[in-house]
Amino acid sequence: VTAVRPGDRVAVNVETFCGRCFFCERGYVNNCTDPNGGWALGCRIDGGQAAFVRVPYANQGLTRIPEGVSDRKALLVGDVLATGFWAARIGEIHPGDTVMILGAGPTGLCTLLCDLLHAPGRVIVCEKDPQRRAFVRAFAPQALAVGPEEVVEAVRANSAHGGADAVFEV
């Protein structure tokens, strides 16, 4: 490992990837074809939540946590926020698009934040739990939070073509 040094605080990508296969070279590291690639940590390799873990291809999968960023804030970077960021990136959201997010748990909320960076025209969050819908309304008033029974009408009413341009099930 040459990208980090002993003692560095790092966030570990939830997926390991070789960086050289067809999919890695195109940015789709979740489809890495290497035997140690993909969802190795926590699946084929124990220790994803441990103090110490051996990370295959650590030069690609570790991100140094900057000084001044607390452990608490850095916690989201390794999985929940990274999932939302990646989803928004590969979802190809364009300004003015109608975006649908299915689920308003921690990953759904991070996806919402990252989707908003792309200036969609409308973001609709479908969540069955009324408390989570209320949180979305308070947290992101520009988003429309609806229950499953309202989702079809909400999408039709908020889209020029009757459907969502990007859908994220998180």
Explain the meaning of each model-derived region.
Residues 162-168:
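Short SAM/SAH-binding signature in class I
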Residues 20-102:
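NAD(P)H dinucleotide-binding glycine-rich loop of Rossmann-like/cofactor-binding domains
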Residues 5, 48, 94, 118, ...:
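Structured loop/turn residues at beta-strand edges in well-structured enzyme cores
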Residues 1-24, 66-68:
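Glycine-rich beta-strand-centered segment in the early N-terminal region that forms part
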Residues 8, 142-143, 165:
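Conserved acidic residues
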Residues 150-162:
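Short amphipathic alpha-helix with an adjacent loop that forms part of the alpha/beta core around
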Residues 64-149, 153:
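Mid-domain Rossmann-like dinucleotide-binding core that forms the NAD(H)/NADP(H) cofactor-binding site
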Residues 13, 168-170:
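Short, well-ordered coil/turn residues at beta-beta hairpins
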